[in-house]
Amino acid sequence: MSSLETQQPPLDAEMEKQRAELAGIIARNTGEDGSYATAIQSLFVSRHSHSHEFASVLAQPALCIMAQGRKEVRLADEEFNYDPLNYLVVSVSMPLSGRLADVSPLEPVLALRLDIDPAEISTLIADAGPLGVPNRPVGRGLYVERLDTPMLDAVLRLTRLLDTPKDIAMLAPLIRREILYRLLRSPQGHRLYEIAIANSQSHRVSQAIKWLNGNYEQPLRIDDLARGVNLSVSTLHHRFKAMTAMSPLQYQKQLRLQEARRLMLTEGLEASAAGYRVGYESPSQFSREYSRQFGAPPLRDMARLRSSV
């Protein structure tokens, strides 16, 4: 488990002032509850004033900053928390679930997300030359890092551009590049670095993850998957689990069940049709695995979700 288990010192006076300014910018650019694209490419801001049950999502690589409030994120059976003291980095696409904490209409969650293009990381590494990023054992593709002054300053300068839109085209790419550089230079930056290096084992695992994300409804043959990314079966299994906390088969199951739940909730599909759509041939197997994942069979789970909306 990776969470905020120990008491951390608060932000210093200057960082607290910057945090408050960041929260104000997000508040001005949201208005109502929801997540909003901005005039800056790949930058999203969000406001939420009510908590909810854990909601599933196929998260893409991103930097997530919390200006106000807290969010709990689950990867398999592990929990990660981030708040104004700590930011969250998703270094590789993976199925997550999350819920908001410390939230009320008077003090809504105010957050931003900056999507990360792995190709942009690769270009930055090539341009910057040796960054002195240490070689370390492969870790989760999701991590929490303490927010420091340079990172907060760069993020604040990026969001300030929302108030001066004429400056966005010239300055946003430069500040975005600075933010990515600071991520690479952070204590856990090796996790992004390893995935971005072509032909590294972590990069090959990320390619296997990408294939599963686009083909989860297909039968999974581990031998073929390993061969496709030029890894042995044992290496793929070991590194895949180290990165995602799941085996490839468990990962595929998560994707299938999350998508089936979405199909039933948003498109009104019956359980058997949703299960078939995501690759299940047996309705009874789908129902069993769905119940284990979400704590109730599909019909009861849908009734619970719809009543909470």
Describe each model-derived feature in a short phrase.
Residues Q252-R261, R300-V309:
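Short, basic, alpha-helical segments at the C-terminal edge of helix-turn-helix-like DNA-binding modules
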Residues E79, P219, G268-L269:
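Residue at a beta-strand N-cap/secondary-structure junction
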Residues M1-A39, F44-S46, H52-E53, N135-L142:
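A short, N-terminal "cap"/entry segment at the start of jelly-roll beta-barrel domains
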Residues L147-P150, I175, I197-A208, T244, ...:
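N-terminal positioning helix adjacent to the helix-turn-helix/winged-helix DNA-binding module
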Residues L212-N215, M264:
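Short helix-to-turn junction characteristic of helix-turn-helix DNA-binding domains
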Residues L4-Q18, I121-E178, R182, A208-K210:
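Amphipathic alpha-helical segments enriched in hydrophobic/aromatic residues interleaved with Lys/Arg
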Residues S35-G132:
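N-terminal regulatory/effector-sensing and dimerization cores
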Residues E178, R182-Q188, I195-I197, N213, ...:
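Basic/polar phosphate-binding segments, predominantly the helix-turn-helix DNA-binding elements
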